[in-house]
Amino acid sequence: MKKKTTLSEEDQALFRQLMAGTRKIKQDTIVHRPQSKKISEVPVKRLIQEQADASHYFSDEFQPLLNTEGPVKYVRPDVSHFEAKKLRRGDYSPELFLDLHGLTQLQAKQELGALIAACRREHVFCACVMHGHGKHILKQQTPLWLAQHPHVMAFHQAPKEYGGDAALLVLIEVEEWLPPELP
């Protein structure tokens, strides 16, 4: 720690002489404006509504036609098949991960809906959904649910480093990002 320097008697007398006639300021603090909320903070009510809206697309009765041979994959008709190839090769690395282990089908649908809503809100293009092996219920249902959602562009069985055949890499269609307007 730095050693304090002491003033000589002469310097102290000079200081008192210079400060004679001054008075104490009543208030010398600056009041700052309250910080504005972060843009990414979303009210809880809105999050719950987004989650419910996103899980609305998942039906157990509708069975989309998916290729049953080879790895699990899907590409929306208006999306290039090259995107699925890039997913397979691991060109996209997921920014969000969802683990469905131990969830019921209803909970899994809600969590998938929340994941897609979060990806769109946070402008995340690629996510990983880990459904696991288990009794193969979620493993079979997850691709069927994802293929029904309009914001899912493509998905492919994940490479080994992201879970292999117990996980899917999902490409999400995100809105174009616009910077927030300043007040």
UniProtKB/Swiss-Prot annotation:
The record ties this protein, via InterPro entries, to: Smr_dom (IPR002625), Smr_dom_sf (IPR036063), SmrB-like (IPR022990)
The free-text function statement in the UniProt record for this protein reads: Acts as a ribosome collision sensor. Detects stalled/collided disomes (pairs of ribosomes where the leading ribosome is stalled and a second ribosome has collided with it) and endonucleolytically cleaves mRNA at the 5' boundary of the stalled ribosome. Stalled/collided disomes form a new interface (primarily via the 30S subunits) that binds SmrB. Cleaved mRNA becomes available for tmRNA ligation, leading to ribosomal subunit dissociation and rescue of stalled ribosomes.
The top EC class is: hydrolase
Question: Where is the Smr domain positioned along the sequence?
Answer: 98-173
UniProt protein name? Ribosome rescue factor SmrB
Q: Which UniProt keywords apply?
A: Endonuclease, Hydrolase, Nuclease, RNA-binding, rRNA-binding
One example GO MF annotation: rRNA binding
Family matches, as NCBIfam families: PRK04946.1 (NF003432)
Report the family membership: Belongs to the SmrB family.
Q: Quaternary structure per UniProt?
A: Associates with collided ribosomes, but not with correctly translating polysomes.
* Coiled coil region boundaries: none
This protein's gene is called smrB
Q: What is its EC number?
A: 3.1.-.-
SMART domains in UniProt: SMR (SM00463)
